[in-house]
Design a protein with these regions (language model features):
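S-adenosylmethionine
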Residues: 113-116, 120-256
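Compositionally biased, intrinsically disordered/low-complexity regions enriched for serine, proline
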Residues: 7, 21, 84, 99-102, ...
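Class I SAM-dependent transferase core
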Residues: 2-89, 93, 123, 129-140, ...
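Conserved S-adenosyl-L-methionine
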Residues: 94-98
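Conserved SAM-binding loop of SAM-dependent methyltransferases across substrates and taxa
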Residues: 99-112
Length: 256
């Protein structure tokens, strides 16, 4: 994949611990560094990310990815909800993974969980397949396709404990992508920037149709750039009707 630039990520051990109640082990830090280097190389051919400066990459791709699963990393994480019930997670899917975020950092952090990286762009999936192989990540797999099609596929529908959606579409569209893929009791995590009560109210009718409820909304500030972020935790409490997800393109064109 070409020569790798030798830019080093910051260690940030104290910030990991203070904000997530967790910090990576030495091998995980090495994997994060290797991931960063391979993403920089891949960026020469593919538009994977505009975030390439080491501290910004650490915050917006590594820390942000893992902030969403903070309850899985530590039951005593600062700022996470005691009400959020997260049993053992064996299968997760990252919908619209792009350059592999949040899926790959989560696979590195949760070695017991198999993470499927879903994207419709074949070139990005081909890159991620090579990256996973080069990094020796055993608990990550790739899948090329649209969420609307994968959600109707018997091999994937109602098959995952955890669904991750970051920077893909409006919340109701993300919910329509994610909830059909979850087992009963499964959890969808929607990574958002700003979030308002009006958006919560607008999301509710879609969740009623999809068999989901809002279990928790976590607001937080990023540790370096001090930006406002939110994670929405949606619980699947009833089977998703067979009509969802609707055909390719329709969820975005006509949101629930």
């Amino acid at each position: 994949m070409g020569e790798i630039e030798t830019l080093m990520l910051p260690e940030m051990a104290d910030i990991w611990q203070q904000t997530l109640g967790w910090q990576p082990e030495a091998e995980q830090r090495q994997q994060f560094q290797r991931l960063y280097e391979l993403i920089l190389v891949g960026n020469r051919q593919l538009n994977l990310t505009r975030i390439t400066e080491p501290t910004e990459f650490w915050e917006k791709h590594l820390w942000d990815s893992l902030r969403g699963i903070a309850p899985l990393l530590s039951s005593h994480s600062e700022g996470t909800s005691d009400r959020l019930s997260l049993p053992s997670v064996e299968r997760a899917i990252d919908i619209g993974t792009g350059g592999g975020f949040p899926g790959i950092p989560i696979a590195i952090a949760l070695s017991h969980c198999t993470v499927t990286l879903l994207d419709a762009t074949r070139k990005k999936i081909a890159f991620l397949e090579t990256l996973i192989d080069q990094m020796g990540i055993q608990n990550a797999a790739t899948l090329t396709g649209r969420a609307e099609e994968i959600g109707q596929h018997p091999q994937h529908r109602a098959s995952y404990d955890l669904a991750l959606v970051r920077a893909v579409a409006t919340a109701s569209v993300c919910a329509e992508y994610a909830l059909p893929l979850l087992k009963p009791g499964g959890l969808a995590i929607l990574y958002r920037g700003q979030w308002t009560e009006e958006e919560t109210n607008a999301l509710q009718p879609a969740l009623v149709q999809l068999g989901g409820v809002i279990e928790s909304i976590e607001g937080f500030t990023t540790p370096c750039s001090h930006s406002d972020r939110h994670c929405l935790y949606l619980r699947k409490v009833a089977p998703t009707p067979r009509e969802f997800p609707r055909t390719v393109g329709l969820p975005a064109q006509k949101p629930l």
